[in-house]
Amino acid sequence: MVKLSKEAKQRLQQLFKGSQFAIRWGFIPLVIYLGFKRGADPGMPEPTVLSLLWG
């Protein structure tokens, strides 16, 4: 096993916490963005922010 200094362990913990935060709070907005960027399937109405909010 690799020996890490206390400072290196703290930096890795911060990196993992930051990654967790980004994945948790960034996944849904990313999916929504990609959906709007791609557009609707042929024959389906265009997505709008209101249709997203009201279902």
Swiss-Prot record:
Record disease entry: Garg-Mishra progeroid syndrome: An autosomal recessive syndrome characterized by a progeroid appearance, severe dwarfism, mandibular hypoplasia, hyperopia, and partial lipodystrophy.
Record-linked InterPro entries: Tom7
Membrane topology field: Single-pass membrane protein
Residues annotated as transmembrane: 21-36
One Pfam match: Tom7
Task of the protein: Required for assembly and stability of the TOM complex. Positive regulator of PRKN translocation to damaged mitochondria. Acts probably by stabilizing PINK1 on the outer membrane of depolarized mitochondria.
Cytoplasmic side: 1-20
Localization per Swiss-Prot or TrEMBL: Mitochondrion outer membrane
This protein's name: Mitochondrial import receptor subunit TOM7 homolog
Origin: domain of life: Eukaryota
Similarity-based family: Belongs to the Tom7 family.
GO cellular component, one term: mitochondrial outer membrane
Alphabetical UniProt keywords: Disease variant, Membrane, Mitochondrion, Mitochondrion outer membrane, Protein transport, Transmembrane, Transmembrane helix, Transport
UniProt GO MF annotations: protein transmembrane transporter activity
Effect of residue 25 to R: In GMPGS; likely pathogenic; the orthologous mutation in mice results in growth defects, lipoatrophy and lipid accumulation in the liver
Segments in the Mitochondrial intermembrane topological domain: 37-55
Quaternary structure and partners: Forms part of the preprotein translocase complex of the outer mitochondrial membrane (TOM complex) which consists of at least 7 different proteins (TOMM5, TOMM6, TOMM7, TOMM20, TOMM22, TOMM40 and TOMM70).
GO biological process: positive regulation of protein targeting to mitochondrion; positive regulation of type 2 mitophagy; protein import into mitochondrial matrix; protein insertion into mitochondrial outer membrane; regulation of protein stability
Main location: mitochondrion
